[in-house]
Amino acid sequence: MTTNKNYLKKTLQLVLPLLLGLFLCWYAFAQFSTEELALIKEQFLRADYSYLWLSVGMGFLSHVSRGLRWQYTLASMHYFPKRYNLVLAVFVGYLLNLTIPRSGEVSRALLINRYDKVPFDKSFGTILTERAIDMCILLLLIAIVFVFQFDLVWHFLESYFTFSYIIVILLVLGLLFVAFLYWLYRSTTSIAQKIRQLLSGIKEGIFSIVHLKKKWQFVAHTLFIWIMYFLMFYVVFFSMEQTKDLSLIQVLTAFFIGSFAIVFTNGGLGAYPLFIAKVLLLFGVAETIGTALGWVIWIAQFLMIILFGGLSFLLLPILNKGNR
C-alpha cells in the first residue's frame, strides 16, 4: 500500500507540472489569430541565433562556476570531492529539475555521496546554503526593480496573482511547519530520531559557510554566477530588432518576472514565454514579438541543460568506474 502511495505521489509530482506547462502553452497560443501565429513563427525564425548560442555558452559557464564554488563549502567540513564530479553533478541536477521540480538539489547530494563518499545530509546542507544565498541576491534584484519600476511591477503582479490567497496559503504552511517542529522536538519514535539525526548533518552543512577558508573565491564565484545568469538572458534581446533597444532596467524587470515562472512548471515550460511576453507588453513590445522572444530565451536555457546535463549524466559513471 505504501509503495502504491509513493508511486502515485511521484507520478503526480512529475505529471501535474508538465500538464500545467502544456496547458499554459495552449493558453498562450490560443489567444492569437492565425495571422498573429504566423507572425510569431516568422519572428522566431528570423531571430539572430548567434545570440542564442552565446546565451548557451554563458549558461554553461555559470553552472561550471556553481560546481567549482561548491568545493569551498565542502572543504570547510574537510571533504574534498573531485572538481569534475561537482560540476557534472550540478548539470545533472538541472537536468532532473526538468522532470520533478527541485529534485536536482537532492540528486546533487546523492551523486557526491555515491562517487566521493560525502555524507548526504552534510552536502545537502551546503546546497541549502547556496539556495539561501541565491535567494538573497534575487531579493536584492527585486528591490532594485521595485525602486525603478514599482507601479508597473505591482500592477503586473496584481493582474496575475491573488495576494489574499497567497497569504492564507503561507499562513497554513507556516502553522503546519510549526506543528511539525513541535512533533519532531517531542517525539521519541525511531523516525523522529532519524529525522533529527539527518537535520543535524544538514545543519552542519548549512553553517559550513561560516568556516570558509576561501571566502573571496566564494564571493567571486557567486558574483560571476549571477552576472552570467543575467547576461545569458540579456544577450537574447539583441536577437530581435524590436527588443534590442530596451533599457537595462526593463530587461532586469523581465528577468525578475521570468524567475517566477520557473516555480510553476518543469523548467518554466509554457509559463516562462507567457510571463516574458506579458511583461514586455508593458514596455510597448507587441505580444507576438514578446512571445517569440520568450520562446527563444527558454529554448536557449533548455538546450543548455539538455546538452550538458545529458552529457554529464553519461560522463559521471564513466569517470568514476572505480568509485562506486
Regions found by a protein language model. Name each.
Residues 1-90, 148, 152-259, 285, ...:
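Predominantly cytoplasmic-facing regulatory/coupling regions of multi-pass membrane proteins
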Residues 74, 113-114, 123-124:
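Juxtamembrane transmembrane-helix termini in multi-pass membrane transport proteins
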